[in-house]
Design a protein with these regions (language model features):
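Solvent-exposed loop and capping/linker segments of extracellular ligand-binding repeat ectodomains
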Residues: 1-239
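A short, polar beta-strand/turn micro-motif
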Residues: 7, 12-54, 60, 234-260, ...
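N-terminal cationic amphipathic segment used for targeting or macromolecule association
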Residues: 77, 103, 129, 155, ...
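N-terminal post-signal-peptidase region of extra-cytosolic proteins
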Residues: 274-278
């Protein structure tokens, strides 16, 4: 029993292999070290001090290393630092499960994951209001399985940067997160079992941000939830004082509805002027290249099943993948002469971007053509 404000310190004085339960042969289960606490408790310091007295290693030494360490500690209000960047199988499994007073999760810097490393880590942490960043781009089996199950305080998911999935990697990840209404994913193809029930029981309406290449017509608790809007994230450049931001977009395989705070234009060259005309019916057809004028630097283009016809005389071309432009191609930029298309000198542009092939009619510091907007 400690008085209010008092502290107790824990540190390992032996190697990880000398500590029962942290050995390389330990397989988890019921016989594991676990804190039991009452009263409001704040954990601090580096959890690696439990396996390394000098806190020099950033590699988890064994499987199940911190399995269930704070499980059912309903009075835990803050978590210790988790500095490891190389993980082992099941190392953080159930670590904070049912820590219902935990408001903020620790940072998770690891980029090399292991099987089930984060499985059920924050499951039923109902006070958690913000999920930690998940920087890893290579998934492994079960790595995030039920990681945030029933975290009812979450409204948005952490960005999911992985472009390819692994079996059960996101299975049940946000299941029963009843207030979750925003997910941003980077993968371009659904995979069997990878997302089983991952968005079961989330908010009835929400936004699912994803690449153009992902199949958006498949809906359900293991894909995009019914009632949610699939959208493409747009980042634009401009001047905040005018609230005018510009970028280009190539719609690839899907059609998109232009929201009210944005205008999409196709382009036709008239002498020294590039005339920009709004797309018909506010729909960017599949395969169309456009200039976007936005009211803010970041916004979303909702996917639509509506149909529209591509412009027959659009001077803009587009690319679905990151590409290097030709020596005489032009890209939209905020250059010395303002917003316009400037010679890009063979530099790359990102995926789903548009460009202007004009054949080198102006130097790099000069706009190829003046721009006029037809409203």
């Amino acid at each position: 029993m400690l008085d209010v404000g008092r502290r107790v310190y824990f540190r390992n004085t032996r190697t990880a292999d000398e500590v029962p339960g942290f050995s390389k042969d330990y397989k988890g289960g019921y016989n594991h070290y676990q804190f039991v606490m009452r009263g409001k408790i704040s954990a601090s310091g580096n959890v690696m001090s439990l396996v390394d007295s000098d806190v020099e290693t950033t590699t988890i030494p064994s499987e199940y290393c911190f399995y269930g360490l704070f499980e059912d500690c309903t009075s835990l209000i803050s978590a210790p630092e988790l500095s490891a960047d190389v993980l082992k199988g099941n190392c953080y499994k159930n670590m904070f499960k049912r820590c219902t007073s935990l408001v903020k999760a620790p940072e998770l810097p690891a980029t090399r994951l292991a099987e089930s490393c984060y499985e059920s880590m924050f499951s039923m942490c109902t006070s958690l209001s913000e999920a930690p960043a998940l920087p890893a781009t290579t998934m492994v089996e079960d790595c995030y399985n039920q990681m945030f199950y029933e975290c009812t305080g979450l409204k948005s998911a952490p960005a999911l940067p992985a472009e390819k999935l692994a079996e059960y990697c996101y299975s049940g990840m946000f299941k029963s997160c009843t207030n979750l209404n925003l997910v941003k994913a980077s993968f371009t193809e659904w995979m069997d079992y990878a997302t089983d029930n991952w968005l079961d029981g989330v908010a009835k309406e929400g936004t699912f941000i994803c690449p153009d290449a992902l199949d958006k017509a498949t809906t359900g608790t293991g894909n995009i939830p019914e009632g949610w809007t699939a959208a493409f994230e747009v980042k634009a450049n401009g001047k905040p004082e005018t609230h005018d931001y510009y970028t280009t977009f190539h719609s690839g395989k899907n059609a998109y509805q232009v929201p009210g705070d944005m205008t999409a234009y196709t382009a036709v060259a008239h002498g020294s002027i590039l005339l920009l005309t709004p797309v018909a019916n506010g729909i960017i057809p599949a395969g169309e290249a456009v200039v976007l004028k936005c009211a803010q630097s970041m916004c979303y283009l909702p996917y639509t099943t509506g149909t529209a016809t591509k412009s027959s005389n659009n001077a803009l071309k587009g690319t679905d993948k990151s590409a290097t432009l030709g020596a005489n191609d032009y890209a939209l930029s905020l250059g010395q002469e303002g917003v316009g298309f400037y010679l890009w000198n063979g530099k790359p542009i990102g995926a789903n971007k548009a460009y202007l092939p004009l054949g080198g009619i102006a130097p790099a510091t000069t706009k190829a053509l003046g721009i006029e907007f037809e409203d």
